[in-house]
Amino acid sequence: MAERSDFWGTCQGGVSLTFDDGMGCHLDRVVPALDERGLRGSFYLLPRGDDWEDRLAPWREVAAAGHEIGNHTLSHTCSGNYTGVRGGLELSSLERIEDDILQAQQRLLPLAPHQDRWTFCYPCYCTFVGQGRGRRSYVPVVARHFLAGRAGGEYGFGNHPATVDLACFWAQTAERMGAFEMIGLAEELTHRGQWVVFVFHAIDGSRLSVASEDFLALLNFLARRRDSIRTATVAEIAGDISHYQAVTGQQRSPSTP
């Protein structure tokens, strides 16, 4: 309870809504729904391909409206264990993944030139390169360049502002969740004074999807509860947590916003 009153002020906890891969449904359906309710989301984009400039151009307006643009790497390299094809993170290196991340960042910067705090999203929630005895975490790479990095997490657990490692904070994958499950997680975990981060991919899609009626019900709940549950971008809440950990002397990961 002390953590709730110390960090969250008049609110009981916080929620961030994150969206991966810069999908068309995010532009067509998610952004308008958020704007209608006065909510802001964090969108993690992949600036890859020869057409990346044209494809990402609409996101300039999204960023200008107050939504967060985040880095999801250039190549979206995940574990080769997902596909059975060699060439994934197991065969990568810290130098290679850092170069990939920084190339993506150079392409993303013009989309949101006003953003002074950038956050990162680990593709497929994988935070390593190499394998066996040569396996290494690339969380320190992310901590070097970003305010925060979104990883995976255990179901039913959020992030405690006093102790969360911002370079590898936890999130709840929302695919296949119904409205009451998402609302229940938001209600219970914020009641405990935690920061709840939801991960969305498709809305009404064929893969990693959430039904639009369930998604909108969550947004309506958060809009109604804005006085008791703070809904803000990852950069906003992570920035406040970083300051809170610094002034209270709590352990925190070094980062360069």
Show which residues each predicted segment covers.
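Boundary/entry segment of secreted carbohydrate-active catalytic domains
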Residues: 1-27
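C-terminal domain-boundary segment and adjacent tail
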Residues: 2-9, 41, 51, 146-163, ...
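Short, well-structured secondary-structure segments
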Residues: 14-18, 26-79, 114-122, 150, ...
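Short, surface-exposed alpha-helical recognition segments that flank or form part
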Residues: 18, 92-96, 210
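Active-site micro-motifs of SAM-dependent methyltransferase domains
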Residues: 24, 76, 126, 205, ...
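Amphipathic, non-transmembrane alpha-helical secondary structure
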Residues: 27-36, 56, 60, 64, ...
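Catalytic domains of cell-wall/extracellular-matrix polysaccharide-remodeling enzymes
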Residues: 29, 34, 50-54, 78-183
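N-terminal/domain-start segments enriched in small and hydrophobic, helix-friendly residues
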Residues: 60-65, 79-92, 187-194, 200-209
